[in-house]
Design a protein with these regions (language model features):
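C-terminal, charged and often intrinsically disordered regions of DNA end-processing helicases
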Residues: 1-34
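Metal-dependent nuclease catalytic regions and adjoining charged, substrate-binding loops involved
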Residues: 2, 130, 161-236
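Short acidic (Asp/Glu) and glycine-rich catalytic loops that position anionic groups and cofactors
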Residues: 17-22, 41-42, 64, 136-140, ...
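Short, polar/flexible loop-turn hinges at active-site or ligand-entry regions and domain interfaces
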Residues: 25-33, 51-53, 145-146, 213
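Hydrophobic (often cysteine-bearing) scaffold residues that line and stabilize catalytic clefts
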Residues: 32, 36, 80, 152-155, ...
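A non-catalytic, helix-rich entry segment at domain boundaries
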Residues: 42-108, 112
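Non-catalytic protein-protein interaction segments used by genome-maintenance enzymes to assemble
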Residues: 104-160, 197
Length: 236
């Protein structure tokens, strides 16, 4: 089967939620946070690919790639749009001061893992002045992760493994660029855990194929389906 980071993460959080989304075809409706985040990602990709590094070009990209769905009304959409303009204006100033060179933007990868295929999409890989590579993931939440949270997060390690196995790029640094918070958190990448991560990705894919979808109620309080799931463990 084909497994992405999203499928892997959701299955490891709660196999029953995985079943809801990827077997039963349930959908999570867009909301203002998800629409804002995707709009900012799309604008950054368009701008970085354009070759025009001006602020006007970045704001033009935001207008062109803005997603209008998910907002309760036009007033709310206008507030979120103004926030996106502020966020990207600040990002532009920070980006212009960096000396790194992007070598990959929204780069898709696939690589074989036994009988499975691992697929993913990397926001950005930069080559730094010393020749090393930095893998960057954009986040649009209000708070940047702490260094400890970054160390515990499997997403960037999943992407770093994909960069090496599929693209032949061995990254030295993992970075979360919290665009909304205006902060970057980085750590050196240690590839020593790649074998264990690959084994767990493969094990998750095996379990999915075998139809093992038992619920894990630890994540119920923040689940999108907590109000209509028979297994939800939510205090009244």
């Amino acid at each position: 089967m084909e497994i992405s980071y999203t499928r892997y993460r959701i299955y490891r959080e709660c196999p029953w939620k995985y079943k809801f989304l990827f077997v039963d075809g349930r959908r999570i409706p867009p909301n203002e946070k998800s629409s804002f985040g995707l709009s900012v990602h799309r604008a950054l990709e368009t701008w970085l690919r354009s070759g025009d590094d001006s602020l006007d070009a970045l704001l033009d990209a935001l207008r062109a790639r803005w997603l209008a769905g998910g907002y309760p009304d036009e007033s709310a959409e206008s507030r979120w749009y103004a926030k996106a303009e502020r966020v990207l204006t600040r990002f532009h100033g920070e980006e212009m001061s960096r000396r790194a060179r992007p070598i990959a933007l929204e780069k898709e990868f696939t690589w074989p893992l036994g009988r499975h295929t691992v697929r993913g999409m990397i926001d950005r890989i930069d080559q730094l002045p010393d020749g090393s590579y930095e893998l960057i993931d954009y986040k649009t939440g209000p708070v940047a992760p702490t260094p400890d949270q970054l160390k515990a997060d499997l997403q960037l390690r999943f992407y770093a493994l994909g960069a090496f196995r599929a693209l032949g790029v061995r990254v030295a640094t993992l970075t979360v660029d919290s665009v909304t918070a205006g902060a970057r958190v980085s750590m050196p990448y240690d590839p020593s855990g790649e074998e264990a991560l690959g084994a767990d990705i493969s094990a998750a894919a095996d379990e999915i194929e075998s139809g093992r979808f038992g619920p894990d109620t630890r994540y119920c309080p923040r689940c999108d389906f907590k109000n209509d799931c028979v297994h939800a463990m939510i205090a009244p």
